[in-house]
Curated annotation (Swiss-Prot):
Classification lineage: Eukaryota, Viridiplantae, Streptophyta, Embryophyta, Tracheophyta
UniProt gene name: rps11
Subunit structure: Part of the 30S ribosomal subunit.
Protein name: Small ribosomal subunit protein uS11c
Positions with biased composition (Basic residues): 9-25
Top-rank lineage group of the source organism: Eukaryota
Pfam families per the UniProt record, alphabetical: Ribosomal_S11 (PF00411)
Assigned GO CC terms: chloroplast; ribonucleoprotein complex; ribosome
Naturally occurring in which organism (per UniProt): Carica papaya
Length: 138
């Protein structure tokens, strides 16, 4: 005789509510990675656990528009809006990369109302390491 097929999605297997618990984070670190093609903003707590993140691509910008300052400003605003709701008041800012969105993202962070402890440029600089790629001929 055939065994009865267990029902998938029965009530006892379904989790109610959100899996993430709403933490109160008074202090955090905002990482801005600005490349020429995109800007990624990640907000972590002081231990480095990611609380919120956003990028110009997830904000709806596609192609070359992802590298623009306006796209970086929108991405920073989206990432910070989520953590302000969780109670973040103070933050440190780490900016990495040579992209156009560096200053625009920092301006959006300053306007959000979060007190900034410091702003640090953590762009990796080689001490004459790897050979750079050849120059483009257009």
């Amino acid at each position: 005789m055939a065994k009865p097929i267990p029902r998938v999605g029965s009530r006892k297997n379904v989790r109610s509510g959100s899996r993430k618990n709403a933490r109160r984070i008074p202090k955090g670190v905002i990482h801005v990675q600005a490349s020429f093609n995109n800007t990624i903003v990640t907000v972590t707590d002081v231990r480095g656990r990611v609380i919120s993140w956003s990028s110009a691509g997830t904000c709806g910008f596609r192609g070359t528009r992802r590298g623009t300052p306006f796209a970086a400003q929108t991405a920073a605003g989206n990432a910070i809006r989520a953590v302000v709701d969780q109670g973040m008041q103070r933050a440190e800012v780490m900016i990495k990369g040579p992209g156009l969105g560096r200053d625009a993202a920092l301006r959006a962070i300053r306007r959000s109302g979060i007190l900034l402890s410091f702003v640090r440029d953590v762009t990796p600089m080689p001490h004459n390491g790897c050979r750079p790629p050849k120059k483009r001929r257009v």
